[in-house]
Amino acid sequence: MDDSWILEVKVTPKAKENKIVGFDGQALKVRVTEPPEKGKANDAVISLLAKALSLPKRDVTLIAGETSRKKKFLLPNRVQDIIFSLHIDV
């Protein structure tokens, strides 16, 4: 677990576009177009994070909040600096 990092994410499903919005305290805010049913929104968040961080989807693991808007993802530690340096249009 030393080579992993937990990222808190606040998700807005059924949005107009898939987008990383910015930070709300310690949590990264994201919007996804998929509805929160049958894991569709979770899969969309995983895809969005993987693309933004240039990671394979298998490196983005949902560890808490499967049915909640507040989620926790396990990511490789090497992306921590990338998360905080993302250019986010608010």
From Swiss-Prot:
Organism classification: Bacteria, Pseudomonadati, Chlamydiota, Chlamydiia, Chlamydiales
Matching InterPro entries: DUF167, YggU-like_sf
Family membership: Belongs to the UPF0235 family.
PANTHER family documented for this protein: UPF0235 PROTEIN C15ORF40
Protein's name according to its UniProt entry: UPF0235 protein CPn_0497/CP_0257/CPj0497/CpB0517
SUPFAM superfamilies reported for this sequence: YggU-like
Organism: Chlamydia pneumoniae (Chlamydophila pneumoniae)
GO CC terms in record: cytoplasm
HAMAP family membership: UPF0235
Gene3D superfamilies associated with the record: YggU-like
